């Protein structure tokens, strides 16, 4: 626990709300917040105590693609700005490719593959290939990549 005064704690809360672009939302009830705003509140709550690690479980679930991109960008900015290690559990390939640096692919609770997003496009691991290329967009990216490298 902390020895901060109530005024100091309120100042810190307002700072992190501002950091996640919710500076005018501190008087709103949860039901008054959109899904994206609720995700940003969760991030603010996670960083208010200056953690060394940020854990995000499906940060984009239930969000439209545009809001999901906003959340991805915010997570990346927070990770860089606070110099923290961020661990994200997601099934969203767009997020993996957008903000994943070191990617660990699990299957049935066991490590199946590990590498970078670039290496993910090159792997022959069948489970990873099936997951990554379940999207037509990523299938086209892989085909273009393989044509370039051959």
Positions of the model-derived regions?
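Conserved ABC ATPase "signature" region
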Residues: 6-24
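C-terminal boundary and immediately downstream tail of ABC-type ATPase nucleotide-binding domains
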Residues: 121-150
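Helix N-cap at the start of a conserved alpha-helix in ABC-type nucleotide-binding domains
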Residues: 65-67
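Conserved ABC ATPase signature
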Residues: 29-33, 37
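Conserved catalytic motifs of ABC-family nucleotide-binding domains
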Residues: 50
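Catalytic Walker B motif of ABC-type/P-loop ATPase nucleotide-binding domains
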Residues: 54-57
